[in-house]
Amino acid sequence: MTEERATVRPVTLSRLVEVTHVCEEGTKSTDEVKAALDVSHRRARETILEAERISLLSERGNEEESVYATTDVGESFLESVRAEDWPQVSSILATHSPHYKAFIETLENDGQGDLDALLERLEVAQEFTPYSFNQTGIEVVGDWTERLGRVQRNAFSGSYYLKDRSEVPPNFHFVLLEAYDDFEQTAGVDLRQRYLSIPRLREEVCERLGCSREDFDDALLALCQQNVGKLELSGAPLDSAAKDAALGIKKMERSNEGGLVTTSQSTQQVMSGVELYDKQYYYLAVYDSDITFNTEAS
């Protein structure tokens, strides 16, 4: 095996799935991986070596030519991908990838942070280990965590945070009102905008609570229906700035193209509002902050 590299290689999650699948049915040389993935020799080597570091592949063969085979860990990895069990895929990476584990741990220990803040924390945390991070490394591992749903990234501020709630808490409405007030204050006295962007509120509240965007939408709709006359949803023109995000929302799903188990990845640049009775709403207005929230009805 080649001498261990300190930083994570720039390999996408879909490539890790592909190379593990390619080597599943028998050992493969670098040239065979190169042909199967339709990539350059350099890219094939990067992918193989990172998959080997994570224990998805093992090196075999002699000094003349190394070949690679999928390990038991790799088999479990593929089984979880086929089942679209993304939490289990995340668990496997957290166990076997030192960079993935370190990324998650710094968010668990120190809370959310943008790229620069995480880089500073990780440099300190990894000082006495064989591993290190640079900006590219954080973007690579951050991409893995986002696509697996373990981490979300505020699409406006770029802050990473753990998605560690399975449902919104009973104080959802208080956190929403706090975020609403904060945005109202930063909008400026002259603007006096009663209607605030739902996509921006969603990103802020999800970061504060560590909840999923889908759970936010469900809770917001329930809250509005439970407090008619106090909260109001409003639509917006198609070119509304309320829908424009600085960053996309990354997702993953399994696909079977040409018999190869891989992942399709989409980055949603335009963020959706919330939908009620087949209509999209992009703004929220608060007329009375004396509201209640029944989680059982959400």
List each model region and its residues:
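Short, conserved, surface-exposed binding loops centered on an aromatic residue
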Residues: 190
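Donor-sugar nucleotide-binding helix/loop cap in glycosyltransferases
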Residues: 1-185, 193-200, 205-209, 213
